[in-house]
């Protein structure tokens, strides 16, 4: 059978030609390239007497909490919270646009009985009735819609932090109300937002709206301790507009020199542009189901001006800590479903590797005092239409996250041709409005950024900032920094593998099932498997050797090795003791059902939690003790052979990776069964178990004890036609006991007959198995 190729690889993968081994050692040999390092020659290490260095403050990064500023009158910018620190009772601030918006906030100290108080607001004397029976301060927001109307109390903030906030954003005025520490925001409409000015009577701070979570934290919990000392002196607001004169914002400073070495401090203002990459994979069948929507790394190259100099930059954006979501509209073939789609949220990170062609990146090996500051950016998702054949299309829409700088490290960035010493900027995430949903489904009001359309039509997202580092470089600029180990850049091979994977996956639609069954029954050896490649016999032999070396490290080969050791230990244990416990220990080497008698009698739910491991072990046992029926590995090997013959991109370098990947990834959803008399016990990788009678195909209770006994002594059979398909076939067409038994045993001749008769249920099942053969 076709799965013979896997057994041959398992058997032969531990022996390789001596010539190939020597060749491999030679290619992986490290080489030291050195120059005369002066007084450091004896240690071969970089100098350890570092200079103190200098790191200039950035002028491009907004602080989170800017202030305090002195009381003043001004027209606030949109998208900035004004955080006012009230220190006495009376009017805190007045704000108006002289058309449809007048508001004044007055502070009332704790424990005040109802009383009329006089306040001067907008140049008028007004009398407000106030009261406060709380232990906290109250801030009454008095509002009127025109100059002729009287003020009324629109909302109240009860606070022990004595902080008040106001924001211009989205055509509305936003303030806080409620009681700390659970105060929340609310808004008021206005037709003339731009003309709103504010008179502030206390010290205040300015916070960008991108840091609204921090503003919320300050309102409810108070300012950081450092802001509550007498050493913090409020400045005039005009200080924000001072133009700082600097000799050079992008500079290289020599810190120290020793022999051939010098320390250089590099300060750079940078503009980071990046984009998200994604992959959308649609399942086969009728066109209503999607396999996955996932993030993938994306490169972006661009130019920008820095101090009048044209800079060429390259970035790679990747994500970590994604959250897996799914949607299942039903079990019918025409029900829309997405098996997995990735979303980045607060627990995720975004990495952006940055490189440019400036001096700072030429000798980035020995680096210290690496620091950076970057602005935040909001990334908003767009729409993606799931183009189903019939009916209104579901649409994934929305979602947003804000990226906040969280650290910087050194990294290596791979392009199609070279590797680049880069800086990796790490960003933490906060979710933002709007939420995302899938229209025409039950998925609504979820937060995060899904991978369906993370760029929202934008060519890139942009972040500005600054970094500084001190690098140890040769004094003579013509020298290159010593490289301790030679590194082979395999990006070209990775690109070939990516193209080959895409080609392999697209070829699934072109495989004829009747030919596949015939091919699955052939005893494929390594020569016949690889002979479809246009090459000589010598090259085929060389490729087979390369495949065996790669296959030796595969999960399948590792599992076989572990299983052999485990069974040897169990056999020796059983020979020393005839107790039930020892026998069960032998059983559990195949099933992982139990370690002792009490565990064997566990419930059905207990075994379901272990079916993934059990199914893997059942695959190994079936491979070692193969029956006459067809196995999943026969189909897997036959599909692999077919795709190798049809491929135009397969070659000596890519074949080992493809064969190894196929053994691990082809047909991930498998079912295995054990046959005893007229009863069948079936288990699959999705955590489901079945027991049923051959004659009627009616389910019976799944006996864990019986399964544990049978799995040791009975042959394991691939459930090519699983129980659900058998049941469906019997209900719609009716099958005899002999046909049912042959399908249960995965008899290839019976399978071929059903396929030749164009039986839609059997054909659909085989098609689904072929479509699972993806890399």
From Swiss-Prot:
GO terms for biological process: permeabilization of host organelle membrane involved in viral entry into host cell; virion attachment to host cell. Residues 247-478 are annotated as: Spike body and stalk (antigen domain). The keyword Transferase does not apply. Signal peptide: none annotated. The keyword Membrane applies. A motif (KID motif) lies at residues 643-645. This strain probably does not use sialic acid to attach to the host cell. Belongs to the rotavirus VP4 family. This is Outer capsid protein VP4. It comes from Rotavirus A (strain RVA/Human/Japan/KU/1995/G1P1A[8]) (RV-A).
